[in-house]
């Protein structure tokens, strides 16, 4: 099936990522972060999971997007929000007590998580006529109405994004900047929690991160999409760019993340700044580096096979 710009029962998260409705690339670099930083990030992640359960039960936890933790840490650091700290036993890790940190940013991120997941489920229904996902989405109707009344701007932006990306795929849009910009516009509105003095910088940060996410996803799926003849705007790039796609994409990705980081550095964030910088300057590149290693291994394997023949 065709892939929409940037794509979460059982494989909900995977399907969300394939559609670009969760990020999949915004994570910490474990090797470069202190133990204290890792514990804090995990506590916010556990808090998001607990909040989703509080909002709509176990089904909410099934829609958990790990990447939304970044948004929680960002908003917590910017607004210096106090945490409600609780110890609990996790069903997946029952051997020792876990710690969850929850604040108003957690509640906001959980709401955005549910809206994105809802649209993924509806999209699955439209594409595949999956009655399981239609039924799952139906169970979120009450939550959708609640969140829409609370955050009409953000929900409206996500709805507009879903409509526009459908049109883009249908018409096989070749303008990469235009297509990536759609994800940027949507993420910009999600990052902008409140219309206040920080709104412009948060929007700018979200816009460039959204474009980065879209391009990284298109780059990761390039070979598969070309082979299966699925929509991917990278297949339309000029011949000279296509000859060295890795370098060209790296330059574009670096440019986008540079703009994102500039906006971050203009925000007066001290709390968790180490975690956020770890993600922005290192963690977001983890998948790219993994893909490079994977490509080199495939090339080496092909050379060995050719040499044997």
Identify the meaning behind each predicted range.
Residues 256, 260:
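An active-site-proximal "capping" alpha-helix that borders the catalytic cofactor pocket
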